[in-house]
Amino acid sequence: MKIYKLQTPVNAILENIAADKSISHRFAIFSLLTQEENKAQNYLLAQDTLNTLEIIKNLGAKIEQKDSCVKIIPPKEILSPNCILDCGNSGTAMRLMIGFLAGISGFFVLSGDKYLNNRPMRRISKPLTQIGARIYGRNEANLAPLCIEGQKLKAFNFKSEISSAQVKTAMILSAFRADNVCTFSEISLSRNHSENMLKAMKAPIRVSNDGLSLEINPLKKPLKAQNIIIPNDPSSAFYFVLAAIILPKSQIILKNILLNPTRIEAYKILQKMGAKLEMTITQNDFETIGEIRVESSKLNGIEVKDNIAWLIDEAPALAIAFALAKGKSSLINAKELRVKESDRIAVMVENLKLCGVEARELDDGFEIEGGCELKSSKIKSYGDHRIAMSFAILGLLCGIEIDDSDCIKTSFPNFIEILSNLGARIDY
């Protein structure tokens, strides 16, 4: 895919940004904890979340879909499927399903694409094995494909050494099948969509005031079925916020955006860098929803070292902002970036250098000198949707060619359409 330099300002109101991926995954998987019809409007119709629907269908759920409205009727009991459960590119789907299936009687095989099958799963499989789960796979169950022989699990008191919503949710789901009350704690607060959704479903879960500790009781009855409208994804919206900031005389309003405090850290970083950006809350249900207004801005360099778990998906796009800011910027304490869909630290630095930017890898992040003269280049996405979309936005300033853009469809199927509607010229 080739993106040409955009010569005109952008002025738009965007209401059709992709639905939130995290909530879409959880809606589908958590529906299996109920016994009545679950309904979601604005479900994300991307490859990752459609794969999750296919997984729960193979476990016995009935699914009705009309456009982005999805209805799920859960099975009376989970079936042992006669096929591999394909998670595609989604670490969320795989890690949550490991936790869900570990305590369910049956035999299950989880696999994914070549990128997912090389991402670490021991952070889930190890603690589950310690409480009685039977999980088998390459490199001591660290790499998929993974085979799970579900059975009753022992209660646990687990302290996670990493701040990860995927680890947390997997352990919550396993706790529902344990033989007694379980506790979970983490070193810093990760995304809390699971807790929010499960509390709305009347799950037997208690959350500490600081959100760091959970008490989970085994399920004694089905949870309350869901009927929700899924808000738009702030991680997807971030690319167009960045576009408005870096393109002269531009302004964009984005509506119905999820504004959960654990999801807007990257926006706060942009504000600290000098971005003219406002977030307004319009609705508070089980999640906070609102709109974002942003316009062209001059950015200043910044050091980012806190709340990294809250901006891990936006880090590649933040690196683009760093490259266009005045002065030096850095991101540290972000070693988790090395085990995402790609090694995002190495890949961002490699590709920024190709575009004329002075960038340096750190063990746990990167350092970028802003204000360098950009040059048109061909970059490699390494199959990582967030790398591809970040450099697509940079391409609006300097022109860019991306070697694998199909990966964008895993999370944001209408990204190219929106970019084109804003005036971008794109060749395939």
From Swiss-Prot:
Where 3-phosphoshikimate is bound, by residue?
K21, S22, R26, S164, Q166, D313, K340
Keyword field contains Magnesium: no
Q: One GO cellular component term, please give it.
A: cytoplasm
Entry's Gene Ontology BP terms: amino acid biosynthetic process; aromatic amino acid family biosynthetic process; chorismate biosynthetic process
Q: Where is this protein found?
A: Cytoplasm
Q: Where does phosphoenolpyruvate bind?
A: K21, G91, R119, Q166, R344, R386
Q: Which molecular function GO terms apply here?
A: 3-phosphoshikimate 1-carboxyvinyltransferase activity
> According to its UniProt record, which residues of this chain constitute the active site?
D313 (proton acceptor)
Query: Would I find Amino-acid biosynthesis among this entry's keywords?
Result: yes
* Keywords from the UniProt entry: Amino-acid biosynthesis, Aromatic amino acid biosynthesis, Cytoplasm, Transferase
Report the superkingdom from the record.
Bacteria
What is catalysed by this protein? 3-phosphoshikimate + phosphoenolpyruvate = 5-O-(1-carboxyvinyl)-3-phosphoshikimate + phosphate
Role summary = Catalyzes the transfer of the enolpyruvyl moiety of phosphoenolpyruvate (PEP) to the 5-hydroxyl of shikimate-3-phosphate (S3P) to produce enolpyruvyl shikimate-3-phosphate and inorganic phosphate.
Its quaternary structure? Monomer.
Q: Which NCBIfam families does the entry link to?
A: aroA
Q: What is this protein called?
A: 3-phosphoshikimate 1-carboxyvinyltransferase
Species whose genome carries this gene: Campylobacter jejuni subsp. jejuni serotype O:2 (strain ATCC 700819 / NCTC 11168)
